[in-house]
Curated annotation (Swiss-Prot):
Biochemical pathway: Purine metabolism; AMP biosynthesis via salvage pathway; AMP from ADP: step 1/1
Binding residues annotated for AMP, in chain numbering: T31, R36, Q57, L58, V59, G85, F86, P87, R88, Q92, R156, R167
UniProt region (LID), positions on chain: 122-159
Places the protein is found: Cytoplasm
Organism expressing this protein natively: Actinobacillus succinogenes (strain ATCC 55618 / DSM 22257 / CCUG 43843 / 130Z)
One function term, GO molecular function aspect: ATP binding
EC number(s) per entry: 2.7.4.3
Annotated segments matching region NMP: 30-59
Binding sites annotated in the UniProt record for ATP: G10, A11, G12, K13, G14, T15, R123, S132, Y133, Q200
Designated name of the protein: Adenylate kinase
Gene Ontology CC terms: cytoplasm
Amino acid sequence: MKIILLGAPGAGKGTQAQFIMNKFGIPQISTGDMLRAAIKAGTELGKQAKTLMDAGQLVPDDLIIALVQDRVAQPDCEKGFLLDGFPRTIPQADALKAAGIGIDYVLEFDVADEVIVERMSGRRVHPASGRSYHVVYNPPKVEGKDDVTGEDLIIRADDKPETVLDRLKVYHTTTRPLVDYYQAEAKAGNTRYFRLDGTQPVEAVSRELDKILA
């Protein structure tokens, strides 16, 4: 079961990735985690990536694909894997295909931009503990204060409306075209494509995923 999750930041991919991993026992593969692990382990690919990153350059697709190939060959990926944050662009999707890494399911979490802005800009965090709240969906007992310590909650820079809108702009320009790409792949019989309504309650989305992947 090889899965790609698509959807804008704040569409609920992280929550459902956790559900899929627990339910089906497959690992989540994050390219960021892989890069950090390869650099820490001092592998050949890790050394190349570190040199580029130290120079402030982006790690090229061929290097990332080589890391993904290494990772999916590990024993814990025998039953499948969940790709998170990759591919982000059509050239990356093409490279994945050229590397012979087939994908069984592409799952898109569809949420309107204004809902994402409301979701993310309503988040509040207690910096010391990492506890998070939401002014609408999961409010603290006292507005602006952590339930446990009574200390002030903050809005992370990432959750400010202007930052969220910038991230959405990047998503629509670079990653959104993958929706059409993978729908075409599904029509050609190369994968199965499902669009889920990410505005539903978390449990409802999980139930739908369970049916799709069962």
